[in-house]
Amino acid sequence: MSDLARTDVVLIGAGIMSATLGVLLRRLEPNWSITLIERLDAVAAESSGPWNNAGTGHSALCEMNYTPEMPDGSIDITKAVRVNEQFQVTRQFWAYAAENGILTDVRSFLNPVPHVSFVHGSRGVEYLRRRQKALAGNPLFAGTEFIESPDEFARRLPFMAAKRAFSEPVALNWAADGTDVDFGALAKQLIGYCVQNGTTALFGHEVRNLSRQSDGSWTVTMCNRRTGEKRKLNTKFVFVGAGGDTLPVLQKSGIKEVKGFAGFPIGGRFLRAGNPALTASHRAKVYGFPAPGAPPLGALHLDLRFVNGKSWLVFGPYAGWSPKFLKHGQISDLPRSIRPDNLLSVLGVGLTERRLLNYLISQLRLSEPERVSALREFAPSAIDSDWELTIAGQRVQVIRRDERNGGVLEFGTTVIGDADGSIAGLLGGSPGASTAVAIMLDVLQKCFANRYQSWLPTLKEMVPSLGVQLSNEPALFDEVWSWSTKALKLGAA
């Protein structure tokens, strides 16, 4: 074992979260030493990879689970506004990064693609009519359209209109300012900038242990997966952005804040088509309602994607299940994560989430023709041979201790950290990558409270609206939107 080395910051995981935090810290503290540790041999090889996530740029423009109908018939847009506010923070940071040479190829990861909500049936049509009215009063969603004309539907979505009888009413909410995001390509540029500016990147290294020292620092024990060599690294601050592996790594640290937390892995599968004739006839991301019992992230959607310069159509997700916490993980991941302090949490979810379990079982039983049949509800002319099944990444949803039920399953992201701010990690999946900057700013504020005020001037250069709710400041929103649109070379698709 080699001698103990020291670094100011350790980032575990080479995905979008560590990439974002790495750039923030590099700009704030250019002289700090930063070490990135990744168990695989590449950047963004797990959840941030383009084929391992939906790439919708979760800005809450089209996801209907963010705009639920209330018992009185009104539409609650609170969650949609909150998510979009976070996305605006991320968008501004990307614009700053593009202007300052951090992101040198914006189009490789960001492309304009409308975001669309799709329903059929008179009840769904009325829901979208009320949804559009509720959103139109907010500056973040002011451009959202309501469309119910079959002719206009066919003009905008020819692939979905082909062979559609229009015997029942259909409707759309159309947000022209949506984007497709390749978070893998983005993470590569961000980490590339970090490495070019002094960050050490250790690929093929797996963290085996985290131990706190008497001076409050951490010793990180890692193993080179190629040679078996073990190394130790001492650091003042650890961030765990390891996707599904974050919970097991935090458990190794022994911090009391992680006790009671558990993880529930949900896999995803998609149908994919690269036929240029198909991609030319569908230039949008179109979301439907979540199926009964499906988790919020289970709403089916038919998306235009851009990966490595090529356009694709992707439909799904179909839920899968594996005890692995990572796509490249082990089947022992789930059982090894269950400990005395979180056993009741896991059992509680097993008893209370029967609908989810039934949904997962039904998804696992789907045949190939049944998957394409679900696609034909969106695109009646879809041909089986045009589509192939692709396996996406794992999402480990948060199970939190609950006094009443033992445990509750949460579909969101949670930052867990030690009280002294020396270690933090991100649990959960959705909305995830799209809100990375807002989440990492929260990590900075919690973990570097004594420095945060001195960092604010620089942070406000990166995110001009920092600390402001743009939905309450339409003039400022228009200003930063115009600036970021120009910097990111975006416009209506």
UniProtKB/Swiss-Prot annotation:
Keyword field contains Flavoprotein: yes
A Pfam match: Mqo
Signal sequence coordinates: none
GO cellular-component term (any): cytoplasm
Origin: domain of life: Bacteria
GO biological process, one term: tricarboxylic acid cycle
UniProt entry keywords in alphabetical sequence: FAD, Flavoprotein, Oxidoreductase, Tricarboxylic acid cycle
Enzyme class: oxidoreductase
GO MF: L-malate dehydrogenase (quinone) activity
SUPFAM superfamilies attached to this UniProt entry: FAD/NAD(P)-binding domain
Reactions performed catalytically: (S)-malate + a quinone = a quinol + oxaloacetate
Biological pathway: Carbohydrate metabolism; tricarboxylic acid cycle; oxaloacetate from (S)-malate (quinone route): step 1/1
EC numbers on record: 1.1.5.4
Statement: the UniProt record of this protein carries the keyword Flavoprotein: yes
Cofactor: FAD
Similarity-based family: Belongs to the MQO family.
Name of the protein described by the UniProt record: Probable malate:quinone oxidoreductase
Native source organism of the sequence: Mycobacterium tuberculosis (strain ATCC 25618 / H37Rv)
Lineage: Bacteria, Bacillati, Actinomycetota, Actinomycetes, Mycobacteriales
